[in-house]
Amino acid sequence: MRNYIIKRLLLLVPIILIVAVIAFFITNLMPGDPVRVILGNMATESEVARLEQSLGLDQPLIMRFFRWLANIIKGDFGESLYLNAPVSEVLFERLRPTLFIAVMAEVMGITSGLLLGILAAVNHRKVLDQFSITLSLFGISIPSFWLALMLMFVFSVNLGWFPVSGYEPFAEAGFGSFRYLILPAVTLAFMQAGLIARMTRSAMLDTLKQDYIRTAKSKGLSRKIIVFKHALKNSMLPVITVIGHNFAVLLGGTWIVETIFVIPGTGFMAINAIMRRDIPVIQASIIFVAVIYVIINLFVDLSYAFLNPKIRYH
Amino acid sequence: MLFLKKYKKYEHPYITTSIIILILLAFLSLFAPVLTDYNPVRNDARNRLQAPSREHLLGTDQFGRDVFTRILYGIRTSMEVGLAVVILTVIFGGVVGIAAGYYPQLDKVVMRILDAMMAFPGIIIAISLAAIWGAGKLNIILALSFAYFPKMARIVRSAVISIKDLDYVDSARAVGAKDSRIIFKYILKNSASPIMVQATFNFALAILDEAALSFLGVGIMPPAPSLGAMVTDARTYMVVAPWLILAPGIMIVLAVLSLNLLGDGLRDLLDPHLKNTLKNREVKK
Amino acid sequence: MRKEIKITAVVVLVALVFSLLLTANVLAQEEDRYGGTLNAAFQMSVAHLDSDNSTDSLITAMMNHVYEGLFEFDENLNLTPHLAESYQVGEDGLVYEVKLRENVKLHNGQTMDADDVIASFRRWLELNNGGQLVAPYFDQVEKIDQFNIRFKFAEAYAPFLNILASPVSNQKFVVRAEEVVDEFGTDVIDRHVGTGPYKYEEWVPDQKLVLTRFEDYTPSSREASFFAGKRTAYLDEIVFNFIPDAQVRVSGVQTGQFHFAEEVPRDQYPLFEANQNIDNVIIYPDRMSMLIYNNAEAPFDNKYARQAIAYALDFEELGYAMIGDPQFWRLESALHEEGNPWHVPDAGEGIYGVYDPEKAKELLDQAGYDGDPIVILSGQDNQMERQGAIAIQDQLEEIGIDVELQLFDRPTVVERRSKKEGWHIHLSPFIKIVPDPQIHQGWTGTNKWISNWDSEESREMDQIFAEMLREVDQEKRYEIMERMQSKLWDSVPYFNILDYSRLHIKRAELKDFKGSWQPFFWNTYLE
């Protein structure tokens, strides 16, 4: 077991290295000139050259790559071209709303997904099952940006239950800041719930077919105990896997909902950075997302191996 | 043959429904020029933002173009992009997956790279690539294929590995059959199922992601109709012309829904074991 | 006798009490006006807040509350001394002597004097592109005494004072505290000490700018009229929120989250009219949509080809496609609108707004156009640019001209347009409100970024332009203006398609708001 953990941790290194390479080259291969955007249309060639030099953008690509790599190992992600602050600082500031949205979406998704999945499995082939299948299918089929706009239209513009956009940080508004995050989280939760419901349902269906369940039934155990105590626990493994693997997708989803609801999180920051070629921020955002995904996956795999000693990485 | 036999054996509400919807969509997109007289890109700005009427079933957009027409052609675009992405993903993913599964030396290197690629949500890779290569249908197809093929490669690789050491393959090898023959005869046949299932889900994903990319402005170039771009355009007019945003959104949902249904149905049909084998940690999006 | 006295006394008393009550009421209303935090929604965010170091007009618009100029424009575009008390122009325009107001307080408590103005001016001259227009003609600035300054020119430059107050982009000259100018030099300023009715509080990039009332503000004694005259800070605090999405800006005002939103979709005008809580603010057509040619690349290095496109387009249809509701746009051929002293009534006659595809094709033949696709380069983020490009492509293709449409995000557009090849047509919104034709945003001379224009015709234009610069006599200058307009419509290095209005909206409880070319929030209060 310990060897497995060590092996996986060691594997992180080459993966993150490759991720860094990909992040750097993707960013710096994008056409578009941030310097001219900063200086405006009337900038002269000499002004452009001057700014390029002070930003270090006139160096050859390979050199910039190694300099950047050396810096990030030290934890220095450079300074944003537009936000006038070190990237690591900006990333840290924007982390909270994104995490809140992601966690809220995940929690909402898990609770409703589990519920829906269990209901479906227990009522296999009956109306409730069909209903749950259909609902979860819709969940994974609706484009998140469209859903966000629909929700905004109905609940914010027409009903006025939630603010349309923007964000007040926790420090200022306390729990009031959650008002701004509910619709974005719900948008993302739809898809999570759909995925989790589907996985739960199929895992439960398989488990419920097993012999030991039949034994428990014949023993006369109540349905509730069978479902929750035995079946659910043993179905959790694939569900947890699905949750873990979809966390990356969830993070990707925050980019879109943050943009639509104007929440100053890491996703909005990343999209803005791409739109105006804020190179240090783009690089950092890409690495950030990838690293989180890799770490979460590691977690999932480890807990997986932990919970099911039968499966091991070859 | 086995496929059809299995099909007739059980009831398949999912597959049937989804195939019906998909045939309908295919019909709409193929016969778009016949079904509507209007040109999807010709402007008629003096007639902008008209509500649905007899002349314009779904009204007109901000350029006076007939929305119904654009929806039909937009479906066609989504289908084209989805199909192209699926084909490319299957080819690339298949080749890489088979190579990795069959030749263990390759496997180590390839898997590391694939793992790293899969560390990014597909949409982010696609956005970045689209930003680099520029917008446009071809670039979107390439960008999405690039984002999806690692997953496909992985699936193929798993299938290959599970087959590779089976008895009948070993005996084929012992008898001196060439690698390529083995690959084609046994491996492809057995990985066909997971490939088909994943391909269907990729089709759905491609439609969603193309819409998202067009929404963000890095997708299909105007004036070509794209359902996602139509949603973007409609945002500004949402309150005065809600039909502009409802129609394309519903279309996207319909297309994606039916494809997901099909994928589910196929998976149930082809290999019930695939559903949630602990080894196969499949991701539906 | 006593009875009369009594009655008179009572009447007087009543009158006194009445007028006291009235005054108290008025005073109380004035008092009542004070207070509140204004939330305004703007569409773009800024990279920093230093107007000398950027061409972003939003920086100036916001910082107009923090900084003031020596001169400002009023609502009739009359140049008005603001931080200046008075001025004199001598020696045929070679010397300007400016007297400053003497008791104007800076945000740091000190009194503004010539040192502050001179330091700010030198910086403006060096960095700001308005200053760079002036610099080639300028000699030096001298301090006469603590409140008097002399500006000396090597060559007469008629637009000088107009540029100082310019409402275009970032061009305006503002007075900053000397200590800040010394501290930052040419680097981006992030500590702000000005003389304006509001002072800088906080800036969160991509989110908001917060300003709070400057309690010791010293207003001008002239009558308030847009940027000139007395500014009263009723609001305690002003928060500029950066909200790129138009619908979100709109929804914010509908729900009361914002009191003001700029640039909202004009198509929603009827909705706002119907809403009791929202007022429409239509800014009169102060924007032009310019069609800009790449004059260095075939086919548009030939003036016949350039003229051809003007004939090939149905301008009215473009109006509907680009802007929409006709109450928000109008066709206008001159660079200056009717009512502006520089308006030339018959500019572009015979070509502007004339839809003649046949003639267009003839002209293209005459120019030797080989049929290669024409590349239209435009930005995605601006509605006019985007919809205009799509509409123009459609119109040109309908008459058989091949067009390649390139819509990109702003950084890519900026990069591609700065090159001499690869694009043919570009659309850009220009500001129409220009008090002086020679600080016209589009007219900073030929061979600049907008035109890539370098030919016999461009040199002729340069000459006309130089003549105008030297001519101090208004009437003679206007004649030169007429020549310039007719030359512009003959060689057409670029042309304006139409003028359009922007629509802002505000909550009904925001009172006394005046819609000008840049939104400002002094003299306006919340009920």
Q: Where are each of the predicted segments found?
A:
Chain C
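Ligand/substrate-recognition segments at binding pockets and active sites
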Residues: 40, 246, 328, 361-432, ...
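N-terminal lobe/hinge region of extracytoplasmic solute-binding protein
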Residues: 41-91, 119-122, 193
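Gly/Pro-rich hinge or "lid" segments in bacterial periplasmic/extracellular proteins
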Residues: 78, 167-239, 247-248, 357-358, ...
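Surface-exposed binding/hinge segments that line
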Residues: 88, 99, 133-179, 186, ...
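Structural transition elements
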Residues: 198, 327-366, 380-385
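Ligand-site clamp/hinge motif
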Residues: 219-271, 282, 402
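Periplasmic-binding protein-like
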Residues: 296, 300-340, 387-388, 488-496
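Extracytoplasmic/peripheral linker and loop segments enriched in polar/acidic and small residues
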Residues: 353, 399, 404-413, 421, ...
